[in-house]
């Protein structure tokens, strides 16, 4: 999973309000630009009043994106965007920077060039245009996302080196897109047979009653300045605001008294305020104390929540805290559990229509991803890196590891040499907890079309997180989908519980609430119980700050090793941990760091030059004279020195003729007219090639299976030689002499 990340309601649940609008308008930035700038950026000749108005509006946009109104970001200072801090040059830089941000936000669907900025800014600021544009571009503030060119439109960024990315979650995919736009050769190795990691949308239900349900990360937490909002905008995907109305019910199904509810909510928030006061007084002594122990001691000290109903209500709020942090309160640091609060994205929490898979699918477009590749070892050194998957060895200049913290804790990937001690200690200290779900699709919506969330209290404190909150996904899933959340200690017990018993319990809760109202609760059409803790590709849900840990550990985990080994993922960002947008932003961050490190190595003349420079189209033509496998218009070659079904090879597809629809699809893919006959290629495993041969039907059906079911992309011979030169070289050399026994299937 690359994030069931913290898709919660605000930690301090606000007073529940009346129903809001059903669909959230994500075009607020467009409206702001239209209102204040007339919808278009003007040329250089403007009145003084026009310039002042434009500058003020662009400053508003920059602030909404997290930039200070009259200062530089720390990253800008480190990048040396101005020669001297303070003064006129810095002020001018900020105005130019804000203009570039506003200019790109006015149309996030196209690449914004430096030349376009020069059209609207005076020539005297050309050096500031370059400084601001380069900083914003390379740090992922502009020209990111989907619908942008995968290859760099800038000539200076056409041969930056090669990177292997481990993990095809949000972090890995955002980094891949960005690195490819920078001119890097990139491949992604994914252990699962699907992309997305901890973001996983499952099609549930039956014919005529299907629903797209997010079993992992589901809520976009705070839409203001959220990069996932940009992706949704680029793809024209509507967002649905999670409405504030969240009625609570007692264990017997009766509604909670609103007066008691409001009072306990106030007590809960005051207890958290007291924790903040207490830790200031205690200083460093509070580092060894859990949030749970402090809250319980304060509750006893002030004598609050004494009655059964009050205690159950307080437990509901505590379960919500455990949900927000994917951890038991007894594990959370009283000092640093909320260290990321100052950085939280503003605005509403939203669901994405059709599920977050739509973002993942768009991010995968054009990115070479190899599925079913469970990484065993990552070797790194001065000359480059090697990623080992079974008997396969993939080589490149650098590697970006985006696996979840739970995988790093399990030490299932061997690093050679071993990771630095401070990084290993940070991995050990950090917390990685659980959130599980019971996802159900019903014949119809019985809980109310105007309700997004409702909650249920528990009789027992140790089970307070079991089905404590329900999300109605009917507004975005396409069906009557309802999700029950399981947090805290209950999420751990959930892992080993019988699914049929879990379903029986959750239906008992629902029927206890709705049957007394005269509402029949039908049996669900389909039910899925998640088990993120036992998932070997995640071993949990998302990170939190455990006792004796701090936000510094996120920074340590994000540190690269030797300028060759890099790390991304929600557990590497102290500002946005446990969120989908945090994972996405960490990928952009590491793309920038990889670019910087690669250029530094180039300047020091230490870059490892790619081998196999003698490979060309003639080599490829020669190899396919004697294919290992031929069926219809498909030919396959591979390394004859191994019988491993997972060993990689090359498939050639010959198009002697094709229908108008297929030809149009191919021409759209390659963005140019194509002449027949035509030969295209892809890289796949021997097992995939053999399975393709067994697909019944003609070549058209096999081609559809290749591109849609296997998710493979066809490329021309030049692109294949550029991308898979080492694989071609390995196959060629193994055919000449059979003395080698190591399979190198991925030097890029």
Annotate each PLM feature.
Residues 45-70, 75, 112-118, 139-608, ...:
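FAD-dinucleotide binding site
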Residues 85, 115-126:
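Short helix-coil junctions and helix-kink-helix linkers
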């Amino acid at each position: 999973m690359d994030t069931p990340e913290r898709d919660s309601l605000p930690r301090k649940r606000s007073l529940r309000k009346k129903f809001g609008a059903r669909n959230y308008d994500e075009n607020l930035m467009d409206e702001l630009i239209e209102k204040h700038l007339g919808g278009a950026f003007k040329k250089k000749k403007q009145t003084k009043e026009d310039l002042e108005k434009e500058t003020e509006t662009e400053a508003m946009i920059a602030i909404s994106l997290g930039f200070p109104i009259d200062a530089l970001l720390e990253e800008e200072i480190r990048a040396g965007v101005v020669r001297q801090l303070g003064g006129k040059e810095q002020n001018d830089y900020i105005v130019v920077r804000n203009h570039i941000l506003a200019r790109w936000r006015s149309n996030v669907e196209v690449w914004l060039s430096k030349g376009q900025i020069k059209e609207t800014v005076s020539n005297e600021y050309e050096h500031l245009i370059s400084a601001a544009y380069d900083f914003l571009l390379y740090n992922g503030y502009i020209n990111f996302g989907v619908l942008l060119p995968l290859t760099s439109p800038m000539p200076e960024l056409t041969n930056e080196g090669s990177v292997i990315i481990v993990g095809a979650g949000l972090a890995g995919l955002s980094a891949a897109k960005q690195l490819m736009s920078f001119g890097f050769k990139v491949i992604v190795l994914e252990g699962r047979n699907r992309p997305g990691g901890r973001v996983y949308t499952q099609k549930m239900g039956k014919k005529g009653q299907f629903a797209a349900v997010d079993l992992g990360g589901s809520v976009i937490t705070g839409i203001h300045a959220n990069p996932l909002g940009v992706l949704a905008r680029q793809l024209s995907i509507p967002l649905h605001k999670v409405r504030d109305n969240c009625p609570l019910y007692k264990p017997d199904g009766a509604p909670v008294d609103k007066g008691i509810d409001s009072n306990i909510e106030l007590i809960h928030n005051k207890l958290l305020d007291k924790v903040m006061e207490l830790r200031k007084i205690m200083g460093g002594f509070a580092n060894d104390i859990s949030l749970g122990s402090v809250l319980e001691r304060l509750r006893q000290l002030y004598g609050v929540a004494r009655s059964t109903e009050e205690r159950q209500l307080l437990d509901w709020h505590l379960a919500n805290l455990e949900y927000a942090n994917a951890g038991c309160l007894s594990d959370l640091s009283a000092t640093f559990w909320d260290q990321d609060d100052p950085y939280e994205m503003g605005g509403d929490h939203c669901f994405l229509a059709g599920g977050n898979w739509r973002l993942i699918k768009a991010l995968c477009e054009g990115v070479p991803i190899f599925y079913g590749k469970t990484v065993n070892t990552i070797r790194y050194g001065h000359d480059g890196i090697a990623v080992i998957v079974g008997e396969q060895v993939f080589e490149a200049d650098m590697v970006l590891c985006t696996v979840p913290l739970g995988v790093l804790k399990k030490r299932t990937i061997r690093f050679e040499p071993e990771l630095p001690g401070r990084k290993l200690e940070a991995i050990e200290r950090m917390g990685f907890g659980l959130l599980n779900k019971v996802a159900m699709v019903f014949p119809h919506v019985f809980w109310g079309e105007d309700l997004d969330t409702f909650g249920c209290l528990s009789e027992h404190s140790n089970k307070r997180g079991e089905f404590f909150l329900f999300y109605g996904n009917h507004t975005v899933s396409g069906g009557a989908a309802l999700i029950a959340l399981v947090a805290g200690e209950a999420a751990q017990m959930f892992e080993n519980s019988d699914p049929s018993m879990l379903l029986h319990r959750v239906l008992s809760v629902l029927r206890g609430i709705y049957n007394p109202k005269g509402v029949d609760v039908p049996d669900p059409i389909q039910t899925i119980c998640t088990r993120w803790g036992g998932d070997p590709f995640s071993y949990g849900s998302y990170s939190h700050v455990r006792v004796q840990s701090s936000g510094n550990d996120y920074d340590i985990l994000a540190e690269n090793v030797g300028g060759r080994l890099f790390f991304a993922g929600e557990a590497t960002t102290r500002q946005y941990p446990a969120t989908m947008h945090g994972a996405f932003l960490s990928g952009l961050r590491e793309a920038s760091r990889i670019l910087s490190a690669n250029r530094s190595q180039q300047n020091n003349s230490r870059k490892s030059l790619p081998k196999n420079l003698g490979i060309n189209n003639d080599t490829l033509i020669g190899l396919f004279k004697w294919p290992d496998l031929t069926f219809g218009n498909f030919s396959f070659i591979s390394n004859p020195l191994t019988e491993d079904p997972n060993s990689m090879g090359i498939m050639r597809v010959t198009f002697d003729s094709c229908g108008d629809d297929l030809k149009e699809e191919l021409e759209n893919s390659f963005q140019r007219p194509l002449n027949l006959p035509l030969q295209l290629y892809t890289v796949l495993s021997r097992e995939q090639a053999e399975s393709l041969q067994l697909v019944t039907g003609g070549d058209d059906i096999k081609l559809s299976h290749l591109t849609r079911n296997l998710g493979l992309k066809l490329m021309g011979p030049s692109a294949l030689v550029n991308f898979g030169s080492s694989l071609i070289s390995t196959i060629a050399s193994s055919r000449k002499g059979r003395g080698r026994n190591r399979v190198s299937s991925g030097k890029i």
